């Protein structure tokens, strides 16, 4: 089974991916973790690495390559804003493709708590990161991140919370 889970920062993709991975014994491959690792490898902050990635499509190509390679083995949760799109562009069809969404201020608050930083700073960083990613996705892939047409499920995570989102997905899997 291959499940893709996407969503903007703070929507709960990692939380849900971990819950599903544990419940169903699936590997969890996260594009965001790959990106963060690559930023650290290059001694850059996330924002610096995002700016670098805007000018160097090799960053995205490497993340994509790793995701596709992992998906070939099956039995995984593939988490990332473009996970569903990357599989589609590589003629791979997941068993279930999910997009999580949430109100921007809810997302900002979640990020602020996770990163232990001021809400205003978290909001500023979140908006900069999203603008950078949106630009990259359009330039590199010709993908509009707001186009949710490829997803089987679109879930409002701020309405349902982690348990509710998990239960909805579990029903879809069965």
From Swiss-Prot:
Residues that, per the record, bind ATP: 7-15
GO biological process: pyrimidine nucleotide metabolic process
Catalysed reactions listed for this entry: CMP + ATP = CDP + ADP; dCMP + ATP = dCDP + ADP
Main location group: cytoplasm
Pfam families according to UniProt: Cytidylate_kin2
HAMAP family for the chain: Cytidyl_kinase_type2
Name assigned to this protein: Cytidylate kinase
Similarity remark: Belongs to the cytidylate kinase family. Type 2 subfamily.
Compartment annotation: Cytoplasm
GO CC list: cytoplasm
Disulfide bond sites: none
GO molecular function: ATP binding; CMP kinase activity; dCMP kinase activity
Keywords: ATP-binding, Cytoplasm, Kinase, Nucleotide-binding, Transferase
InterPro entries: Cyt_kin_arch (IPR011892), Cytidylate_kinase_dom (IPR011994), P-loop_NTPase (IPR027417)
Entry's EC annotation: 2.7.4.25
Organism expressing this protein natively: Methanococcus vannielii (strain ATCC 35089 / DSM 1224 / JCM 13029 / OCM 148 / SB)
């Amino acid at each position: 089974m291959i499940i893709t889970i996407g969503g903007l920062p703070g929507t709960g993709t990692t939380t849900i991916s971990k819950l599903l991975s544990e419940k169903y014994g699936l590997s969890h491959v996260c594009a965001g973790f790959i990106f963060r690792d690559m930023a650290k490898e290059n001694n850059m902050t996330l924002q610096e690495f995002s700016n670098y990635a805007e000018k160097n499509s090799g960053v995205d190509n490497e993340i994509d390559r790793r995701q596709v390679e992992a998906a070939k083995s099956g039995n995984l949760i593939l988490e990332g804003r473009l996970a569903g799109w990357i599989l589609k562009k590589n003629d791979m069809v997941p068993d279930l493709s999910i997009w999580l969404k949430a109100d921007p201020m809810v997302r900002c608050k979640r990020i602020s708590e996770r990163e232990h930083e001021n809400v205003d700073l978290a909001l500023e960083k979140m908006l900069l990161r999203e603008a950078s990613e949106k630009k990259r996705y359009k330039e590199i892939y010709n993908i509009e991140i707001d186009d949710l047409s490829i997803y089987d499920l679109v879930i409002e995570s701020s309405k349902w919370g982690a348990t509710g989102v998990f239960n909805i997905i579990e029903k879809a899997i069965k």
